[in-house]
Amino acid sequence: MPTPLSLQALAKKVLATQHISKDHLYFEILWFMVAFFDAYSL
């Protein structure tokens, strides 16, 4: 199960390796957070 820290590290890695818009990055982080908390609640 991913942890918030691993997701943060993933986001930083994506920023360092790809040129994406901030809106897209926000959407990806939000999606990961929702998936994480949904899995945690099960």
UniProtKB/Swiss-Prot annotation:
Q: According to its UniProt record, which protein family does this protein belong to?
A: Belongs to the asfivirus MGF 360 family.
Q: Name the keywords, alphabetized.
A: Early protein
Q: What exactly does this protein do? A: Plays a role in virus cell tropism, and may be required for efficient virus replication in macrophages.
| Induction annotation | Expressed in the early phase of the viral replicative cycle.
Could you tell me what this protein is called?
Protein MGF 360-20R
Superkingdom of source: Viruses
